[in-house]
């Protein structure tokens, strides 16, 4: 017997959490036959809330801090983790989850919107650690290797998704700041030796204040600082509202308020206040007194209207109606329900919203549900040009053809909270005019900015070891796939210049003989890669953390119709492996449909792909030959599932997530029964393959019979496990066959 190995499968949120109820027992049953124990770790939003407040709970209600435990595990050489998408909670999502837990008898405290006492401040601090992208930075102890697997790419070529045609006279464009933003104010320094730096604000009267405790830096670490001017931002936003009206296009704002949980909600709030300026000019005081905070979106104002007296409320509503009439039309998230692009910060996430718009002829939906040309407002100009270059390319050359286009895999710098995505704990809304300085332990001023009240100042860190690992990964991928690799770096940008010095030094240490490796500024890199993509050629994008995020949505959505079908591997720096299931989110709309119609359209293809590479990694690390057989047969089963079109469909009564899990089980069992590499597995799975083959029609009928009516799983953020499991296993015949295994 080989020694038992462990794979950790994360329990997360929304659609992937429901899918886990169905898929995980199948995976555990198969893995058991290869001496592999598949355990779960609960890193869901509700699980993380409960773990943060043990002293508020009874002994029986307490849960371990699974995220902290996983954060330690990923530093071990034997780590093997399958990571599903989780919620990056905005304040509205966080408060909804808290309310749900409280209604179930968990006495967790309320989220203090305006903490006054020390206790409230301590509670708020704990909740703020759960907010935003709180999971990925803890687990991502490696860089990112994301690509479309051959089977998926071939399927997309044979079964192309819809692509909206582009008109040569499309008025769609990106609007971004030309000065006063983070990009134009960036400074960057590489520290030669380990030190710590203080971030000190000095006001006009000379009063000094440390904005946080000192930040420890390692030798060779790159630090950057930048500031966005509030004055410049407000002027820019007002200009764009006017310009959208003049051009007759929709106004839309594209931010990432979930991940960039300090800076982007502030920017979002300014956009709401500028768009609805007359409302705030006339009623700002009364709205503030009613608890309105539009950093949580315009929806927050609507939700608090009932706190106003009847006359004020009527006046505010009339003013809102007048603004809608006078201003450009807003892009809509849900035109039927009147939900605009400015209602909820977590509804429009730039990396998903921009590719969706580009795929839809460069259009978003107006209040009547009609597609219209759009002004896409992306205030900070660091990466906005990549989207403008893509729009220009489509306007000139027309839409891409999924049947002939190439692919753009990504190697992303991500480890140890690199760059902007690690900046939240070093991001501050400045309270008064003055200066912010970054000062090292010896008292040297490394960077300094003049700042104004309301400006957003931030510092980022990029450690040396992750950069070295990233360059190595890029060279490995270029060689293994025999594909040109482009570093998307702008030598005129301070941070990129610092990074480039390291990239050149580390490339010189590696064998790059015969490889095509180049460095291009992001817009040029985009044009180069888009040109090759249209010609059916492949190009690896080698990028920093933000572009990793943006491009692994942009290119897959154009190539495959979704980013959930990506292979997303995180080779951990200490030798373990983390396998992320796709590059998409947790699909709240899928859950909404499931609760209303008992039809879950979530596609678990990302999980199937991640499982196969997880088994393969385990086989290579431990010499477990059975794990390799599981990997190979799972890949074959996944390909068969795609070719036979057994992925979930959109409408109730059709095959859904549970049906696709049945077909995966059927094909996987058939492949195991047919293979000759491992006799034990062959014998073990032959009866299951026979039973499922015989009962296929009956099982599919049982799975579709339950659809078309509402289902109760006892919660949203914290569903009742028994009810959810029951809902996700509606076929008695399938359950029986699995149990026999």
Tell where the protein language model's regions lie, with residue ranges.
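Terminal, compositionally biased segments used for targeting/anchoring and flexible tails
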Residues: 644, 648-659, 687, 709-713, ...
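Extended, well-ordered protein cores
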Residues: 2-269, 278-502, 506, 510-658, ...
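A glycine-biased, small/acidic residue-tolerant capping/turn segment at secondary-structure junctions
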Residues: 700-717
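C-terminal accessory extensions/subdomains outside the catalytic/core fold
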Residues: 719-741
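Short, charged, amphipathic alpha-helical segments
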Residues: 682-690
